[in-house]
Amino acid sequence: MKVSRIFLVIFLSGIFWLVIAQFFFCTRFQYKQEASAFQGNIIYNPYANINAANWEKCNFHAHGNAWNGLTNGSGSAADIHRVYDSLNYSVHCVSNYHQIDTVDAAQQNYVSAYEHGFNLMKTHQLVLGGRDVEWLEYLFPQTSNNKQDILNYLSLDTNSLVILNHPALRNGYSDKELSSLTNFNCMEVLSPYGISEKQWDIVLSAGKPVFVVGNDDMHDIYNKEQVGRMATILNLKNTNQASVLSALKKGEGYGIVLGKTQDPFQLPELMHLLVKENKLDLQLSEKARSIDFIGQNGKLLASFSDRKNVQYKLNTSDCYARAKITFENGTQIYLNPVFFTNTTNFAQVQNPINFTETIIFKVIGTLLYAAWLLWAWSFINGGRSSKSNRYEIPTFPDSTFPEFN
């Protein structure tokens, strides 16, 4: 009986520790009450220095068999690389959960990758270029402080890059959090689990230079329906890891969703996007059914039909303008934003630690866990039910009390 109590207490103590660690021991932060839109005297154009001959197709999010089959993924890393090579992908990563695959580490186009997160609400991040896996995780539905704490830890390696994965899935990040959280470089706007266009505009409207990524998020390499559906197109002189991460951080690329009849070997491309005296000049390799310019708070700024070349004048009130391009066969291109700024140093402003709240919550958490351990010790030892501690009711002889007639 006592053994079973011990095992029960150990199990419950572990669960309670996870709760205390997540909701009381996690660092707490101060967040801006109002987001700041893009503004400044400079117009940043991520496509200012591109060469239309240097577009390379990339996929950074793919799962294979890992952790002895415990996670969702079929096929080996070698299978994944072989299939993406056959589809003319210049860069393709294996991003298993909390595991950096090194099968192709000797290749010139190898980029280290892993997906961080195994929590209930699918609040996941993709880490590219990291040398070690960050194991800090919060299992239960996460608070804003939990999410910021994880992003801070993932960003400690300044040579790596952090991407918010499928934010539209299960509301992994709320609208308010997208406005306030920092320390991520890109967003997986294009995913088979949802197009996070609204979420991207929330981030951009908060004045954060976060750039688009499109990925297959493939879990079964043998299923043709999961491969080659979405991609990131980067402008690269070479395909080594440093060049790939640099292009992603500068926004020198775009996301693409392939239509059902799209030839994967003949994709439409951006030829140029020039900015002169606030006027944007966009040229495509082929005619598009529609070209939409979208700005602050997701506002439609302008729309064009059946064109391959369009111009749009960027106003300061627009804050930013990004183009969404749709072709006749359903293929879509999502360009990165052109925006007003005062600097091209895109280091994000950190959310400062709220030291007072952090200390108070850690003290409360410590007291709660200490109280739990005291109760657990009492429970294991049977509480007050043992004979040695039982209160005995005294008895008195009959002569003690007078008789009443």
PLM segments and residue spans:
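Glycine-enriched alpha-helix->loop->beta-strand junction motifs that scaffold or abut catalytic
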Residues: 181-187, 207-211, 230-231
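Short glycine/proline-enriched coil/turn segments at helix->beta-strand junctions
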Residues: 105-109, 158-159, 208, 287-289, ...
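A metal-dependent hydrolase metal-coordination microenvironment
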Residues: 22-167, 172-174, 180-182, 188-203, ...
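C-terminal functional module detector
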Residues: 1-51, 221-405
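Residue-level detector of solvent-exposed, low-hydrophobicity positions
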Residues: 68, 104, 191, 197, ...
